[in-house]
Amino acid sequence: MEITMTTAYYRHKYCPDTSYLRPKYIYIPKTPVRKFFESLIPPQIIDSEKWTDLHLAVGYKNIKLVQSVCNKHNINIKDAKGRTALELAILGDNLEIVQFLVQNGGVVAPNNMYGWSAIHLAIKVGNLDIVKYLYENTKFNEHDKYGLTLQNWAEKVGNEQI
């Protein structure tokens, strides 16, 4: 009998070498915020991306909603692509939410799956206000995983004014 992905999945208890195929689920409760977003975004997408209420609120760019769902226990949780709420706020070009997340424990220093810290991402996006805020108010890794400095990054992405 040939073992395919399907049979290996169903037989994971009997095939220890295929235990890595077991799906990893994270339980996310159905809060009022989550129900609201499920009316806008298909629930399958929310679940597959592993978005929390905070990720959704940051994506919606609503500071009051971010403040209401934010707590220090979930502020640095990553989604399926390894992005924190702070990184999503930087990608969304929203300084007010970036400031709120940093003041409430959003971590800038850990690198994402590409080896960039949040300040590298801000340089790539090109928002001078966010870069300045992160530079003055946070601790960060000056070099990415390839050894490039912040200045190298600015030149590489064409944002020399940073």
Curated annotation (Swiss-Prot):
Biological processes annotated in GO: RNA processing
ANK repeats mapped onto the chain: 49-77, 81-110, 114-145
- Matching Pfam families: Ank_2 (PF12796)
The alphabetical list of record keywords is: ANK repeat, Repeat
Drop me one GO molecular function for this one: RNA binding
UniProt-listed PROSITE patterns: ANK_REP_REGION, ANK_REPEAT
Q: Which PANTHER family match?
A: 2-5A-DEPENDENT RIBONUCLEASE
List the protein's name. Putative ankyrin repeat protein RBE_0151
Q: Which species expresses this protein natively?
A: Rickettsia bellii (strain RML369-C)
